[in-house]
Amino acid sequence: MNYDLTDQLQLGVSRTQDDHETEGFDLTSVSAQYKLDENTRINVSSGSMAHENNDPEGRAYSINGERLWVDGSRTELRWARAEAGFDNPSAGISAAREEMRLGHEQMLARDFSVEVEGIRSKQLDGTEEQNSLGVIGEKRIGATALRGGVRGIEQKDAQGSEDFGTYILGADRGLNLLGKPFQIGAEYEQAFNDTSRRRIAADADMQL
């Protein structure tokens, strides 16, 4: 539920309950969005999650700033933190983790852009830490977007640190399903020197 307090300030409140004996949860969140101008906005949110199986309750917080530029380019800065008991898969951050992300997508042509993204992520209940810097190009052909790029990753834990590089391939396609906008996408990432170290992701989104 969202409330427009002024032309610049919007507040949101939500609650989701699942009464399943072992997987159930009670999730509440509060968010605020402030528009500095037509192209700049700041989002702040806080949520809490309780579990039906009496696992510890957890909280999560996030701050996000976004700037849209005249040529269609975009800059985004995001900080998020989730306690161990906040394991909501749609939160955008894993439980017991803190992350900082800075990204800039530069439009080089009407149908081609390059994104530079830096991420710093650390485990709250351990010593694991990961830092990465990636460059990804995207080419749009009608309703299809093709992506390719590289990423450098540094991983640290109590045993030491490791550096490696990956390549990224992905695609998205916009469709019309039952009269509603529908989008599907997939992405594949693999380390250059280790074929067993890879990531495969797929998603679908439909506006109701």
What is the role of each PLM region?
Residues 1-208:
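Gram-negative and organellar
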